[in-house]
UniProtKB/Swiss-Prot annotation:
Stretches the record annotates as Important for agonist binding: 116-121, 425-429
Main localization (coarse): membrane
Protein source organism: Cavia porcellus (Guinea pig)
Record's protein name: Histamine H1 receptor
Record remark: domains: Histamine activates the receptor by forming hydrogen bonds with transmembrane domains 3 and 6, squashing the ligand-binding pocket on the extracellular side and opening the cavity for G-protein engagement on the intracellular side.
Coiled-coil region(s): none
PTM info: Phosphorylation at sites in the second and third cytoplasmic loops independently contribute to agonist-induced receptor down-regulation.
């Protein structure tokens, strides 16, 4: 056996041992990488699906006019945050996991951390402001409709994103404000405050625990309000005829232009004139007055007792409705004290029923309706003017109440969608923030695989959100089918 010049058997054996050690060291680093390949493939698929689904949501909102609503602006904000998580945060996290070390340098590390914290926080805040919007829409439907504009919603969304971007300050400039408590660990991508307990606890409370508790409180109130409204409607539907039945009775009724032996206490101004003695004289007209039960009111007193009171109505030729005069006279004959006793303000909540549906009456509505009741009856042309004003106010009131009812139906479906979004949000993020608090107080309790699992469980929320929209929203479902060319 020959040797190379200058190479002794001892030195050759030492070289072979060193080469063997180097190969074994290489195998020790590549073997875990190969074992992680199936996991890397799965996580890469999750990232691609997250990007595709959130792009689909954004395109659906942009292309479908039915989705151009104020409420969907919050969905767009949530989808943008989830898109950043899927397109930027997930791929860099997969590379970090695959190599078991950060190899992209400190600048890209800070960029990745910034995008991770900002997008995740923006996603949480988007769910929070969406919850507030649903809460106000259900609790204050008429009042909030005037306030609920795209401009105000956009300003709220902008504020949520600006608050989320505040994370950039401690991530990039912690060492400028606070003295570092420890040296950065080699081949690790982590913030300068990773071992600062008080800061981590404070941010966890502000970013997750406080918004989550508020969202749960809001959603409980939403659930109770929707449930109460549904119970009111069931009560009304079981006790009152529908508007179509009333209309059928009206068409079959025999209408006389003059009451049999009675003079109508409230004449149509076009059918009345006033003579010198101040007596109303009927005038010929093609319009007729008939008694018609047009609506009923469901009231709830302070003790929680629910009762109904019928509201007799008058239908006037072209279909306008107003309260019958006998009801008006009973109100006008009340003294000042009894009027105060029976005023609308004494009832905490009232619901009016049209076509079998119950709608809340707001203070503005009731004050408008009660206006003509508070004064004394007038005669002649003044009573005709009062009649026109009262009819117009009743029409406006019923229009607002009907709009409120339609809005309430939409908000009931939106509350269901919000419930699914909140459930996915809490289930995905609470393990991470619980473990986040544990390692903040017990640094020896840190477990890298568990920590990585909780992080990716939070990322998975960005994948689930766009799946929830079509499941809980018919317009999203139809739009998705149209875009993907799926037959209905």
């Amino acid at each position: 056996m020959s040797f190379l010049p200058g190479m002794t058997p001892v030195t050759l054996s030492n070289f072979s041992w060193a080469l063997e050690d180097r190969m074994l060291e290489g195998n020790s680093t590549t073997t875990p990488t190969r074992q992680l390949m199936p996991l890397v493939v799965v996580l890469s698929s999750v990232s691609l699906v997250t990007v595709a689904l959130n792009l689909l949501v954004l395109y659906a909102v942009r292309s479908e006019r039915k989705l151009h609503t104020v409420g969907n602006l919050y969905i767009v904000s949530l989808s943008v945050a989830d898109l950043i998580v899927g397109a930027v945060v997930m791929p860099m996290s997969i590379l970090y996991l695959h190599r078991s070390a950060w190899i992209l340098g400190r600048p890209l590390c800070l960029f990745w951390l910034s995008m991770d914290y900002v997008a995740s926080t923006a996603s949480i805040f988007s769910v929070f402001i969406l919850c507030i919007d649903r809460y106000r829409s259900v609790q204050q439907p008429l009042r909030y409709l005037r306030y609920r504009t795209k401009t105000r919603a956009s300003a709220t969304i902008l504020g949520a994103w600006l608050l989320s971007f505040l994370w950039v300050i401690p991530i990039l400039g912690w060492h400028h404000f606070m003295a570092p408590t420890s040296e950065p660990r080699e081949k690790k991508c982590e913030t300068d405050f990773y071992d600062v307990t008080w800061f981590k606890v404070m941010t966890a409370i502000i970013n997750f625990y406080l918004p989550t508790l508020l969202m749960l409180w809001f959603y409980i109130r939403i659930y109770k309000a929707v449930r109460r409204h549904c119970q009111h409607r069931q009560l009304i539907n079981s006790s009152l005829p529908s508007f179509s039945e009333m209309k059928l009775k009206l068409e079959n009724a025999k209408v006389d232009t003059r009451r049999m032996g009675k003079e109508s206490p409230w004449e149509d101004p076009k059918r009345c004139s006033k003579d010198a003695s101040g007596v109303h004289t009927p005038m010929p007209s093609s319009q007729h007055l008939v008694d018609m039960p047009c609506a009923a009111v469901l009231s709830e007193d302070e003790g929680g007792e629910v009762g109904t009171r019928q509201m007799p109505m008058l239908a006037v030729g072209d279909g306008r409705c107003c309260e019958a005069l006998n009801h008006m006279h009973s109100q006008l004959e009340l003294s000042g004290q009894s009027r105060a006793t029976h005023s609308i303000s004494a009832r905490p909540e009232e619901w009016t029923v049209v076509d079998g549906q119950s709608f809340p009456i707001t203070d503005s509505d009731t004050s408008t309706e009660a206006a003509p009741m508070g004064g004394q009856p007038r005669s002649g042309s003044n009573s005709g003017l009062d009649y026109i004003k009262f009819t117009w106010r009743r029409l406006r009131s019923h229009s607002r109440q009907y709009t409120s009812g339609l809005h309430l139906n939409r908000e009931r479906k939106a509350a269901k969608q919000l419930g699914c979004i909140m459930a996915a949000f809490i289930l995905c993020w609470i393990p991470y923030f619980v473990f986040f608090m544990v390692i903040a107080f017990c640094k020896s309790c840190s477990n890298e695989p568990v920590h990585m699992f909780t992080i990716w469980l939070g990322y998975l929320n960005s994948t689930l959100n766009p799946l929830i929209y079509p499941l809980c929203n018919e317009n999203f479902r139809k739009t998705f089918k149209r875009i993907l060319r799926i037959p209905p």
